[in-house]
Amino acid sequence: GEVTFHLTIDPAEAKILAEEFQSNFCLFICNPQADTIIESLPNVFKIKGVENLTDISIALTSAFRILDESPKGPRRACIEIISDILLQHHAVQTRRWLTQLITELRSRAFTTLAVMNPKMHPLEEVHAIIDLFGGEINIYERAREEKFLKIKKMHNRKYLESELPLKKERLEK
């Protein structure tokens, strides 16, 4: 029963979570086709895209108002729209918007996970965004399509510095 906010372009499996956990899972879909992707539910916020960051902020503010009435406890936010926002608004505007959002989420006891494809952006823009967060976890591929997970930084936390192999059969069990 932990409160979770999920911001995405394509909800995929998150649609099921939004339908099953309406009291503690808020889904924010930033997609012009949002109305055809999922039915209207009280915990689903449909935004026309990432072009207007104010629209996203307004939807989040609406969800925060609902959240203020729920019991306190662990909260999580997953922001999967970073790459799309960075492509549309570049580093300065994205960083300004994210700084405000992260501050708001922290003040409401959220742990935030941001998902970004660093290969889509210039290195300076990637670092401008990564520096806003207290940690960095990379998932990458090497030869033979093997995937690895490596924690690059984790503020005020102990962590394993070596990379970990990710095996699909382990994830599916």
Language model features by range: what are they?
Residues V3, C26, G73-R76, S107-V115:
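Loop/turn-to-beta-strand initiation segments
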Residues G1-K48:
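Conserved P-loop
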Residues H90-T111, N117-K119, E125:
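Conserved binding-pocket/active-site segment within a compact domain
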Residues F110, M116-K173:
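Phosphate-binding/switch region of NTP-binding enzymes
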Residues E20-F21, D68-P71, E104-R108, I130-D131:
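Conserved catalytic network of the ASCE P-loop NTPase/AAA+ motor domain
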Residues D10-A14, P32-T36, S83-D84, P118-P122, ...:
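Conserved nucleotide-binding/hydrolysis micro-motifs of P-loop NTPases
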Residues I9-A12, E20, E51-A59, V92-R96, ...:
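Charged, alpha-helix-enriched surfaces in structured cytosolic catalytic cores
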Residues A34-T103:
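Phosphate-binding/switch loop-helix module in NTP-utilizing enzymes
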